[in-house]
Amino acid sequence: MLIGVPRELLENESRVAATPKTVQQILKLGFDVIVEHDAGFKASFEDQAFLEAGAKIGTSAEIWQSDIIFKVNAPTDEEIAQMKEGAALVSFIWRMQNPELMKKLTAKKINVLAMDAVPRISRAQALDALSSMANISGYRAVIEAAHEFGSFFTGQITAAGKVPPAKVLVIGAGVAGLAAIGAANSLGAIVRAFDSRPEVKEQVQSMGASFLEIDFKEEGGSGDGYAKVMSEEFNRRAMELYAEQAKEVDIIITTAAIPGKPAPRLITKEMVDSMKPGSVIVDLAAATGGNCEYTQAGKVVTTENQVKVIGYTDFPSRLPTQSSQLYGTNLVNLLKLLCKEKDGNINIDFEDVVLRGVTVVRDGEEIPPAQIQVSAQPKQETKAAPVAEKKESKPTDPRVKYGVMAGVGVLFLWLASVAPAAFLSHFTVFVLACVVGYYVVWNVSHALHTPLMAVTNAISGIIIVGALLQIRQPTGNLFIDALAFVAILVASINIFGGFRVTQRMLAMFRKG
């Protein structure tokens, strides 16, 4: 089958649905690829790069006659008219916001797979295009804020004076919010975050931000991987928190969105008016109405008190090269599910929950949204397990303890009387090493067990040296040789395993 990649026609859209790297992966699945002339130009992908990857370059008319169309945005009426019956379209569709588009797609009798309908389950993460684009949006939001902000993000002490670090508030700790937290923290800002889902607190803190909480308990998870609409009391408390923080912070990044509905209004004009001059608000929900009252989609609004409100709706397109690569990889991973035989043909198997979830039109028939349980469920209240009755243990007779100690003492005295002086010296050191080693190892933090394993390589090396010396003894005692061989084998396992674990540990601290 032939896969066509057209040029995106929307204004300010710089992405493309395939890159030279993803073309190579598609060809390995048995498909042919044709890319429209200059489709990847805005994303820094020349036609020559696609040709070298194995694709063909064609006209718009040739592209839309392909068996499968890979696209970023939903098609226009003219593009739909050019598609042939029975073809497959893979792109963002947004069926709930575009009922008229769905009617036109079903009338064409084609198959439509919506990348915005990927189920939020673990197995579908590799093709979750929404998360890929949200990650880029969160990162780019910080870059845009830094561009408009008139100072450093990180604090500095210079000969000219002290520069305080910027304070950043991120509202919403989803994929975009976490990306914004990471980017702002890496630039040296003091980052705070709020989310209605208490289960994301650890994620926020692990990214280096402070998690803000309100004195009101309400479960924020909706069971579909998104935050649910909260009660009026919760929203009132949250608005009080936003108003308090607005007076302190320099930058606010809002990411709150409700699928298929207008974005919730979180930042009022009064809050913006209370912010310091030069502050910046980045509204990632501008496309669906915005979280801020001052937001205007696609524009930067400067208020009377010199606060800039950024309402761009094309954050992923502002990083077109990376966005195209991630989106193209998502499409390749979807194609692997559609073409498990790698024979260049697709099979929309509804037994696969992922394919069932993304399919919105099949053979001209609109498919209702699938009810798929998400992998990340909100925490359920656990019932306390019944406490088992404790059986009273009888106290140990102290005479038994003293008897054991006396027996050990007698055994040691006997060994001291019959054993050579060298053995007694080594035995004493061995006993002391066991006692000291026990208390040292068991008092080490769990986080340091991996580095501790690396240190044991040296100890195992000493064991191997001792065992090798025993094997070389002229007596030729078979029992001693066997024990020495076992010691070498066990110590070698510890050494090789220790080096392997150490290598993996050190790799965690390398970039790239």
Curated annotation (Swiss-Prot):
SMART domains for this protein: AlaDh_PNT_C (SM01002), AlaDh_PNT_N (SM01003)
Keywords from the UniProt entry: Cell inner membrane, Cell membrane, Membrane, NAD, NADP, Nucleotide-binding, Translocase, Transmembrane, Transmembrane helix
GO process terms (BP): NADPH regeneration
GO molecular function: NADP binding; oxidoreductase activity; protein dimerization activity; proton-translocating NAD(P)+ transhydrogenase activity
Catalytic activity: NAD(+) + NADPH + H(+)(in) = NADH + NADP(+) + H(+)(out)
Protein's membrane topology: Multi-pass membrane protein
Class of enzymatic activity (EC top level): translocase
Binding site for NAD(+): 125-128, 175, 195-197, 225
Self-association and partners: Heterodimer of an alpha (PntA) and a beta (PntB) chain.
Protein name as catalogued: NAD(P) transhydrogenase subunit alpha
UniProt organism field: Haemophilus influenzae (strain ATCC 51907 / DSM 11121 / KW20 / Rd)
Gene: pntA
